[in-house]
Amino acid sequence: MLTYKAMYKFLDQGVHAEVLDFPGTITSGATLEEARRLLASALVDMAETNLLRGEPLPQPDPSCTDPEADLEEPIHLLLTAASRVRIVPRASAPGNGGTYSDT
């Protein structure tokens, strides 16, 4: 588990939410609860994207702060590993004279 810092700004149009120490993790919601839920989802999406690209996750920085934030709080990133196996028929496997499709 990695613990980052979330910040929220209460605006007339809703709540702006951002993970201060994970660049690009930004969203907004109509309410604080919606913004929290969407920010948690955005954090997972950003982390998975980094990993799929072979990029490291940013290190949490507890010293990150935004003086304009109305609320700052920890946000926890929990990732799980998954395996995916694809069965390729022998005649279609590369090198066996058949055609191969990875779709």
Predicted features, each with a name:
Residues M1-T3, R37-T103:
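Short, charged, surface-exposed hinge/linker loops at domain edges
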Residues P23-E34:
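A short, exposed loop/beta-hairpin motif centered on an aromatic-Gly-Thr core
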Residues Y4, V15, T25-T27:
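Structural detector for hydrophobic anchor residues on beta-strands
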Residues M7-D21:
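Short aromatic-glycine-(Arg/Gly/Cys) micro-motifs in beta-strand/loop hairpins
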Residues L20-P23, T103:
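Short, proline-centered helix/strand-breaking motifs
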